[in-house]
Amino acid sequence: MHSLPIEPTVVASLRAELARGALTAPVALELMRESYRNYVRHNTQSFRMLFSHLLEDRAPLVIHCTAGKDRTGFASALILHALGVPEEVIAEDYLLTNRHYKRDLSSVSDLPADVLDAIGSVNASYLDAAFDAVGRDYGDVETYLRDGLKLGAAERTALKKRYLQA
């Protein structure tokens, strides 16, 4: 079992806004986008380790996080990018979460429905925010894969051989 620490800072931010009485759907949406940007800014090392495990391990790997949609969603998008999947397919795959994810928000049922929707589902703008951060920090996804995640041509070929069917 591998643990890759990626701390979800969004929870503390949401609680702070709630305590100030300022938690609205637009605020929640922006906090979610900022959380995704921070995956790139502060957690590239953890995502690099994920790819290390994908390349080294022989057993199947399960990738998950608390809700199974945000950190896992970004990790899955990175894996698909590394495998050469077209961006529009990656975006469609990410948004399938909203169709198949059964969220349990009973612990935060006192929040307005639009805020619950913002934090309990995925939004294309969340993934866009992460890849905008990739663009700002690395120029493009290919450079992020190569320089940030240390996936050169040999590693990408090995991933494709291991995880794609002919």
PLM-predicted stretches and their roles:
Residues 1-62, 74-166:
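Cys-dependent protein tyrosine phosphatase-like superfamily
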Residues 67, 71-72:
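Ser/Thr-glycine-rich phosphate-binding loops at phosphate-binding pockets of nucleotides
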